[in-house]
């Protein structure tokens, strides 16, 4: 029993071959400029097997291309500058921007009104006041000291060989003087002081300021110290070295204490502030 050969116009029922033909027809309609390989109609004997081999064998030198999304021509690539940066913006519920950028020049410092600075410093002192060590004798600290006007000053000077004459705290620092008994021509007088309750200390030399009124026979030395800290006290003691001996005046072991201003701007003459609004 013989089987008849199908006519040449009969398309074999092969799904892969049909899919290949459909894909070629789609790309030909979308990309007319693409070159298609010439197809030769196979002979009578190689119709079925030649079509199958072309459907399964991959074409050489060709790459698969995806169809354009819009169905139109090729889209031109978007040019992007290397300096282009992406920006991200944040907005609140009303659509307003949450971030505000302000640019400052290094040479131009922002101008802050003086009353704002005073308020900020006052708040900082109130916040950190419990953390600061309380200087010894802070309750007894005063803005000015004048031991020379007290009774018994001459007797105390003879006993100690050195005594504080006067000291006063101002906005620019402390100015004071001391008297020392004239025991020799060469003598050295200095002031040891501290602004943090003697956790740290420094020593400042005193300069000869001439003879002091008798009695007893004595010389006067003047000194200058930094201003007391705000809300605190400056502690100091006097030191006298002469002929290999050393004498001290530390207010009977309590140290001398000068009180600073309670808050910034409390000392000195008030400064005008109206012109700040016109900067």
From Swiss-Prot:
Residues 248-256 are annotated as: Substrate-binding motif. One of its GO terms (biological process) is glycogen metabolic process. PROSITE patterns: CBM21. Expressed in skeletal muscle and heart with barely detectable levels in liver. Residues 176-198 are annotated as: Glycogen-binding motif. Residues 28-86 are annotated as: Disordered. InterPro entries: CBM21_dom, CBM21_dom_sf, PP1_regulatory_subunit_3. One of its GO terms (molecular function) is protein phosphatase 1 binding. Keywords: Carbohydrate metabolism, Glycogen metabolism, Phosphoprotein. Residues 154-259 form the CBM21 domain. A motif (PP1-binding motif) lies at residues 87-90. The modification Phosphoserine is found at residues 16, 33, 66. Coiled coil: none annotated. GO terms for cellular component: glycogen granule; protein phosphatase type 1 complex. Pfam families: CBM_21 (PF03370). The keyword Zinc does not apply. Residues 51-65 have a biased composition (Basic residues). The CBM21 domain is known to be involved in the localization to glycogen and is characteristic of some regulatory subunit of phosphatase complexes. Acts as a glycogen-targeting subunit for PP1. PP1 is involved in glycogen metabolism and contributes to the activation of glycogen synthase leading to an increase in glycogen synthesis. This is Protein phosphatase 1 regulatory subunit 3E. The gene is PPP1R3E.
